[in-house]
């Protein structure tokens, strides 16, 4: 489903823990990292798509998370010309995204990257709140900056009230 301007409707998901860190996931078989995201199917609301993508990509369900916020507006990024599939109709030139900030209320062990035969991610870790803005692929950087600015006050208030983590592992491989 591509809109008239060539953008695919999509949801993005920022998952935070009680310390205000965010989940940073490594794309399957690659060296690139990003937040979970995925397309909105016809007839599906952004929230429904978010829960579907949440399970498909990281194995979490409604009971494992709490919605803290969502972006007020759709945020867009254009794909680099080399990534546009010019031979498909309609041509998708980028994504327009509704973002959700979720708090993990379950355990780290509930995260499972192997819920599909074609997983999106093969590893993940908790990182400091602003880390993804500097590390994401360049064409998504402006959207990430805007998302993180919009969600910052909510996440920072969580971090201020949370106990500090004890000896948390820095990186986790896929379960399976």
From Swiss-Prot:
One of its GO terms (biological process) is mRNA catabolic process. Keywords: Hydrolase. GO terms for molecular function: mRNA 5'-diphosphatase activity. Residues 6-149 form the Nudix hydrolase domain. Its EC number is 3.6.1.-. One of its GO terms (cellular component) is cytoplasm. It is an enzyme of class 3 (hydrolase). Its cofactor is a divalent metal cation. A motif (Nudix box) lies at residues 38-59. Signal peptide: none annotated. PANTHER family: M7GPPPN-MRNA HYDROLASE (PTHR23114:SF17). Accelerates the degradation of transcripts by removing pyrophosphate from the 5'-end of triphosphorylated RNA, leading to a more labile monophosphorylated state that can stimulate subsequent ribonuclease cleavage. NCBIfam families: PRK00714.1-1, PRK00714.1-4, PRK00714.1-5. Belongs to the Nudix hydrolase family. RppH subfamily. This is RNA pyrophosphohydrolase.
């Amino acid at each position: 489903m591509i809109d008239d301007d060539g953008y695919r409707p999509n949801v993005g998901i920022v998952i935070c823990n009680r310390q205000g860190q965010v989940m940073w996931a490594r794309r399957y078989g690659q060296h690139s990292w990003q937040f979970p995201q995925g397309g909105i199917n016809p007839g599906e609301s952004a929230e429904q798509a978010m829960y579907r993508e949440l399970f498909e990509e990281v194995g979490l369900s409604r009971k494992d998370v709490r919605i803290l916020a969502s972006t007020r507006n759709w945020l867009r990024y254009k794909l680099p010309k080399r990534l546009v599939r010019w031979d498909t109709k309609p041509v998708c030139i980028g994504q327009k995204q509704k973002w959700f900030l979720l708090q993990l209320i379950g355990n780290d062990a509930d995260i499972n990257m192997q819920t599909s035969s074609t997983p999106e991610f093969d590893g993940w870790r908790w990182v400091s709140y602003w880390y993804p803005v500097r590390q994401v692929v360049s064409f998504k950087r402006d959207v990430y900056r805007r998302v993180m600015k919009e969600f910052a006050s909510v996440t920072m208030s969580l971090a201020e009230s949370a106990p500090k983590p004890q000896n948390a592992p820095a990186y986790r491989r896929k379960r399976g």
